[in-house]
Each structure stands twice: as structure tokens, then as C-alpha cells.
């Protein structure tokens, strides 16, 4: 279990009046658990922390943040949440659906609010009654994926596409809705599809090999953390086979996939921090605080992969632009710290 303790503090500016009658800054304990070590989720956590620091300075308060990453291990996740409870945190933050669901269960009947981040289907996963009115002591931010838009990107780049591979982890709640939406869309379009799944990196590698053998023209993966973790080990397989991999997060493109189409995860992290502050500082009721959703529309193209697939980036960009709010470029790396999207 990787554990990191961060104290985000802001000092209240001193005036002669305050020196005569000191004003004590409020202190809030926040426990953040990340589901897995991947670039998009790490970007969310980084932006939650930096935004809380800004809010602390603005309001003259202190956020004591405990951060852990369970690396998709359920027993480790359980221990992290138990530690947060033992530490009497004022609020828990669950990054990704599995963590949010466990936090919801662990805090049921208590006064500890939960804020989730990067949950693709908050209603379908049972976290909230509705996006507008969560109904319990939980709310958060969603990275809902507009699956049909990714399908349209595939068709824009290759109007003659005949068969699409669907690569995902059946155990990832974040993939369930998106995969069904992809099937429905492809059925309507009369495009053949084949499903391959994996729950570990080794299984994902075998699934990628199977899709290549299946002769697919392109591969689609939603915001699936299992596949994201394995991307660095499979992207070259798809390049060698001449198969573009379209995905539901820019971190996939960072790790070698052809395209990542998604929300702005940095902004999502900042908005999650705003929600944390609203609940702790301004006493907002999570049950009545609407889940915040974001416009999809940013396509991030890995220019190195694009070139190796024999595609011209300018041509791809021209095909994508009518379907996107923006088209970004990126090159292959392990983390966003190593490379800046253009």
C-alpha cells in the first residue's frame, strides 16, 4: 500500500486587530483514496490537492489531506477506508467507481459525507438516486463518456470500417453502460463487433492478441481502469497490426493508444475540490448537491502512434474537428509529468 500524507494549509493574514484578538483557522480532515495508479486518475488527485490549497489560501482555512492508492486491491482499499474512519476524517473522496461504492457502504448511517470523482455512471452503479438529487450523504463529479461520439470518430477516420473490437474488463462498472451503448450504436449502423475482455494485464494482452487475430479494423475501450493500466503493454501490438485504438480517456493516448476522447480530467479534479469545500466550509448538503457532469469533446491524438499507423495527423485532425470541441496532440509517456499535451 502506497501512502502519502499531505498537509495543505493556509495562514490567515495578520492584522493588528487579529494580533490583539487571534482568529483560529478552521481545520478539516479529508481522506482521498485512488483506485489505481494511472495518469488520468493521478491527474484528478493532483488537481484536487492543488485546488484545495488555493481554496485554503482564499478562505484562511486548513485542509489536512490523507492520500492513499489501493492499486485495485479490495483488501487494501478496505484498510485505507478503515484508517480514514479511525482518523475521524470529515469527508472521504473516492476516485473511481469501486472506491466510491465501498466508501458509500462503509459510511452508511454515519455523518461522514462522501464525494466521488471520475464515476462514469453514478445512477447505474447505485451511488445516487439521480444526478440532480443524489438523495444520500454522497455526491461528486462524473466523467460520463459519450460513446456514440467515439464511434463517429472511428467512422470519420475510416468510413469503410467493417468490424470493431470492444476491449474491456467485465468487472469494471465504468465500462458496462459504455459497452452496451457501443453495441447499440454499431447494431444500428450495421457494423460487426467482437468483444474481448481481461481482468489482469496478462489477460488484457491475450485479449489484444485475440482482437488482432479476429481481424478488427479498430478497437474501442471506454474509461476502463484495467485496460488503462495495461495500455503500455498492448499499444505496440495494435500499432504493429495497423489497428487504431480509440479510448475514453486522454491517459490512454498518453500511454500509446491512437486516440483518447474524454472530459478534461484536470478540470474535473478542480471541480471535485470545489464540491469538497462547498460541503465542509459552506455546509452544502450532499443529498441535495447535484452531481457535476462535463461536456465530452476533447480528442487527444498520439502523434507518434498516428505516424506509425501510416496516418497523417493533419488529415486526421481535419476529419475529427467537426465532431470535437478541440483536437490535441500528445506523445507517448508514462505520466503527464513527462510530456505536455499541445
Placement of each model-derived feature along the sequence:
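Sec/Tat signal peptide C-region and signal peptidase I cleavage site
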Residues: 19-25
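An alpha-beta-alpha
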Residues: 30-32, 48, 139-189, 289-306
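Hydrophobic alpha-helical segments within soluble ligand-binding/sensing domains
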Residues: 121-163, 263-284
Amino acid at each position: 500500500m502506497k501512502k502519502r500524507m499531505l498537509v495543505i494549509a493556509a495562514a490567515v493574514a495578520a492584522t493588528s486587530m487579529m494580533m490583539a484578538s487571534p482568529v483560529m483557522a478552521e481545520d478539516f480532515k479529508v481522506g482521498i483514496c485512488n483506485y489505481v495508479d494511472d495518469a488520468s486518475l493521478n491527474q484528478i488527485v493532483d488537481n484536487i490537492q492543488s485546488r484545495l490549497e488555493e481554496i485554503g489560501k482564499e478562505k484562511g482555512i486548513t485542509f489536512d489531506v490523507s492520500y492513499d492508492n489501493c492499486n485495485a486491491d479490495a483488501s487494501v482499499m478496505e484498510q485505507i477506508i478503515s484508517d480514514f474512519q479511525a482518523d475521524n476524517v470529515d469527508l472521504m473522496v473516492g476516485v473511481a467507481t469501486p472506491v466510491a461504492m465501498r466508501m458509500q457502504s462503509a459510511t452508511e448511517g454515519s455523518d461522514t459525507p462522501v464525494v466521488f470523482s471520475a464515476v462514469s455512471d453514478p445512477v447505474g452503479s447505485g451511488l445516487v438516486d439521480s444526478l440532480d438529487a443524489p438523495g444520500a450523504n454522497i455526491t461528486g463529479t462524473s466523467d460520463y463518456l459519450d460513446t456514440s461520439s467515439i464511434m463517429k470518430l472511428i467512422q470519420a477516420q475510416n468510413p469503410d470500417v467493417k468490424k470493431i473490437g470492444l476491449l474491456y474488463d467485465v468487472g469494471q462498472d465504468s465500462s458496462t453502460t459504455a459497452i452496451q451503448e457501443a453495441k447499440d450504436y454499431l447494431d444500428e449502423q450495421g457494423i460487426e463487433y467482437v468483444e474481448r475482455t481481461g481482468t489482469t494485464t496478462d489477460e488484457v494482452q491475450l485479449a489484444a492478441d485475440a482482437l488482432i487475430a479476429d481481424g478488427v479494423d479498430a478497437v474501442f475501450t471506454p474509461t476502463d481502469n484495467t485496460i488503462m493500466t495495461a495500455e503500455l503493454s498492448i499499444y505496440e501490438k495494435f500499432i504493429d497490426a495497423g489497428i487504431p485504438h480509440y479510448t475514453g480517456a486522454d491517459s490512454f493516448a498518453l500511454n500509446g493508444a491512437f486516440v483518447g476522447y474524454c472530459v478534461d480530467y484536470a478540470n474535473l479534479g478542480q471541480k471535485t475540490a470545489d464540491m469538497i469545500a462547498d460541503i465542509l466550509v459552506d455546509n452544502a448538503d450532499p443529498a441535495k448537491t447535484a452531481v457535476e457532469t462535463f461536456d465530452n469533446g476533447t480528442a487527444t491524438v498520439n502523434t507518434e502512434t498516428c505516424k506509425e499507423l501510416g496516418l497523417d495527423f493533419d488529415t486526421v485532425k481535419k476529419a475529427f474537428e467537426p465532431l470535437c470541441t478541440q483536437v490535441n496532440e500528445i506523445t507517448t509517456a508514462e505520466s503527464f509529468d513527462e510530456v505536455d499535451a499541445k
